Amino acid sequence: MTFLASQPGCVQSLQPAAVPTDLCTSLARCPKHMRDGPCGGIAPDGSCEADAALTCPFLAALAALPWRNPCVPAGRPPPRSAGRLEAALRAGSFVVIAEAYTPDSADLSGLVARYAALAPYVTAVNIAEHALASPHAATLAAAALLERAGVETIVNMTCRDRNRIAAQGDLLGAAAVGVKNVFCVTGDHPCRGDDRGARGVYDLDSFGLIRLARQLCDTERLVGGRRLETPPRLFVGAAANPFSPPYEVQAERVAAKVVAGADFIQTQAVFDLPALGAFIDQLHAFKALDRAWLIVGVAIITSLEQARWLQRDVPGARVPDALVDRLATIPAQRQRAYGLDYTLELIQRLRLTPGVSGVLLFPLHGDIDSLAELVPRLEPER
């Protein structure tokens, strides 16, 4: 078994590592073959997203995980890219990022037009890759077209859909078309999508992909040792799900991703601000936010149906019962206005929360109109 080396300052390459027996057992049982598990898809009862009858095997092997007790290097890293997102974060601005989902279409002109219209109000557009493990138009193609239209993008890359050979090519290709930011995730298991016969790759997990991105940028070499003629300059992001089990190690896991090379962290949708505050305190204890920036996910709920879906189907969302109950009392034609006002207030509270550097706005069920209605009402970046 091999892991990508994670020591600060080391040459980040594939090196053999001894794996404790209990961790080997967990690796063998994990449907995603996680090397640095557990993933963010664990249900509240501890069951695996790929098999409800399987308790996540990593829950019994937490002490043996290679990323425990991370030592985050002091201070911010040197500038990574020439992008607007990194510049805004370094300047202390509160950034606004809009989530985009590519369509089931070979024509991306509509997507480009809609998000280009949002560009004056957002710092960047985060392009999801095959969301919920269902196929859509290629993320890199959408990014190339949006960058050409003057919209800064964050390209999502999942380990589900590529091995390390393809990952290296895609990282180089992203930089070649003007992408400054990448977001490295393990990816939902294919069983969550609409083609359950598909097989996930999972040659790497999110930790491995983060290290791989940093290796290409910092050592200017591919994993096999070949020197790059022109290395990429990428601002590397990682995911956090603060309210997914095992709760007690989520902040530590984020800190370990920062050690691996993550420059910014984007969370799943958050509603519980007191719990978020406790999570941020834990991140500070690990000094993770001394080096990386935290961007909090905000779901734009515009209907009772959306609220119930989030509450039922999205691990860690913690949609307040009070919000669901309130929407249930509001006529359908007024739920949208209420939801937008609720979201705006939530963003304003996050802006005042120490440790939060921005928000990632999720339009639910393809409702791009909700973004268009919301972002002009936000305070400008400052």
Regions from the language model: what does each represent?
Residues T2, N69-Y101, S105, S109, ...:
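N-terminal amphipathic alpha-helix/helix-capping segment at the start of soluble metabolic enzymes
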Residues F3-V72:
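Cysteine-cluster motifs in flexible loop/terminal segments that predominantly coordinate metals
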Residues P77-P78, G187, G200-E229, A239-S244, ...:
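Active-site pocket-lining/capping segments in soluble small-molecule metabolic enzymes
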Residues G92-S109, T153-I165, L234-V249, L327-D341:
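Active-site mouth loops of central-metabolism enzymes
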Residues V96-Y101, T123-I127, T153-M157, V182-C184, ...:
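Hydrophobic faces of well-ordered beta-strands that scaffold small-molecule active sites
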Residues S105-L118, A138-T139, R164-L171, P246-K257, ...:
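Short, acidic/polar
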Residues D107-S109, A133-L145, N163-G169, H189-I210, ...:
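Active-site-adjacent beta->alpha loops and helix N-cap segments on the catalytic face
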Residues R164-A176, E248-A255, A278-D281, T302-W309, ...:
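Catalytic cores of alpha/beta
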